[in-house]
């Protein structure tokens, strides 16, 4: 069997942050790309089509549409939505359904994006007391384990830490609501370091995996380019945008009072106690260039200035 990807690659989540980055990276590398979308008429879907992505309409609840989308496809990029309060089985159901179709279609390479520390959750502090988002971590592990056990020709699981694009819309409004006032107010301790990766780097790893399936086959790869304190994050944002940004560490109660959701604050406490713990040198050992946060800020300068909502160079007193 040939390990060379010469046919199309199906990208799921292509209208989102990770899938979109992967689709663009694959196009730039010369691959033929299909995107599984529910509604081809959306702005994001049309933007992909304008770049040369072939849109295929499909839904995880319609297996026939998945079979059609997978026809003549040699590679699949998989990324799933996490559990929803009204649908706790969402990630497992959609992940396994896509995996089943990919296995039946005998794709050459299956690249799945999960999260760093997935599979290690039972070692988390207070795991047995359900302190953390149990279903989130269990869903990630369940899909990862199924991929490893399904008997695919080649597969790799990418496990990114926090994605830098969380500082951009739409995620920033929920994750860092105070950034609009030039502040990052969280329950993250001053000494806590947050492992981060750019979405484009995930795209680069996906391209490398589809380009050389045998090299990546069977690996689970934790991804982060840098580990920064929130003060270092604020400094990089200030320097890169010309807008003054400060970081403030609050108690959990204070963080919630200032607009952070309880679930978000819980994840910030997890950052303090556990964190992603990515071996950045191991990630670098694959030889794929990784983006430093300052580089990422520079490349998203105007978008970040709009998020911060202040004129470049303005001071706290001028707001």
For each feature predicted by the language model, list its residue ranges:
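Eukaryotic N-terminal targeting leaders
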Residues: 1-8, 313-319
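Rossmann-fold cofactor-recognition segment
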Residues: 49-62
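Short loop/edge segments at beta-strand edges and connector loops
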Residues: 57, 159-160, 249-251
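Amphipathic terminal alpha-helices
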Residues: 286-319
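Terminal hydrophobic/aromatic helix or amphipathic segment near a protein terminus
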Residues: 221-222, 230, 234-277, 310-319
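Oxidoreductase cofactor-interface core, primarily capturing Rossmann-like NAD(P)-dependent enzymes
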Residues: 2-46, 61-64, 68-71, 78, ...
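Hydrophobic "lid"/C-terminal helical patch
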Residues: 206, 210, 237, 268, ...
């Amino acid at each position: 069997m040939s390990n060379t990807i010469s046919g199309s690659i199906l990208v799921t989540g292509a209208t989102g942050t990770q899938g979109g980055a992967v689709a663009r990276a694959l196009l730039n590398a010369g691959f033929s790309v299909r995107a599984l979308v529910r509604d081809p008429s959306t702005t994001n879907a049309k933007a992909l089509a304008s770049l040369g992505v072939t849109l295929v309409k499909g839904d995880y609840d319609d297996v026939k549409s998945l079979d059609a989308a997978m026809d003549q496809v040699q590679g699949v990029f998989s990324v799933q939505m996490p559990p929803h309060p009204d649908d706790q089985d969402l990630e497992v159901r959609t992940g396994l359904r896509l995996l089943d179709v990919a296995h039946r279609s005998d794709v050459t390479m299956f690249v799945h994006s999960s999260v760093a520390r997935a599979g290690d959750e039972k070692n988390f502090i207070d795991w047995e007391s359900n302190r953390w988002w149990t279903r989130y971590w269990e869903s990630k592990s369940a899909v990862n384990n199924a991929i490893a056990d399904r008997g695919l020709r080649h597969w790799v699981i990418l496990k990114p830490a926090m994605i830098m694009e969380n500082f951009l819309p739409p995620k920033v409004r929920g994750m860092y609501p105070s950034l609009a006032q030039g502040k990052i107010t969280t329950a993250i301790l001053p000494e806590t370091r947050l492992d981060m990766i750019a979405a484009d780097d995930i795209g680069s790893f996906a391209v490398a995996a589809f380009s050389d399936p045998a090299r990546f086959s069977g690996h689970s790869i934790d991804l982060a380019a840098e580990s920064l304190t929130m003060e270092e994050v604020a400094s990089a944002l200030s320097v890169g945008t010309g807008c003054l940004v400060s970081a403030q560490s609050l108690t959990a109660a204070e963080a919630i009072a200032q607009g952070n959701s309880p679930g978000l604050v819980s994840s910030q406490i997890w950052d303090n106690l556990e964190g992603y713990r990515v071996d950045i040198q191991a990630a670098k050992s694959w030889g794929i260039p990784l983006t430093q946060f300052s580089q990422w800020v520079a490349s998203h300068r105007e978008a970040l200035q709009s998020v911060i909502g202040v004129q470049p160079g303005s001071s706290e007193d001028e707001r």
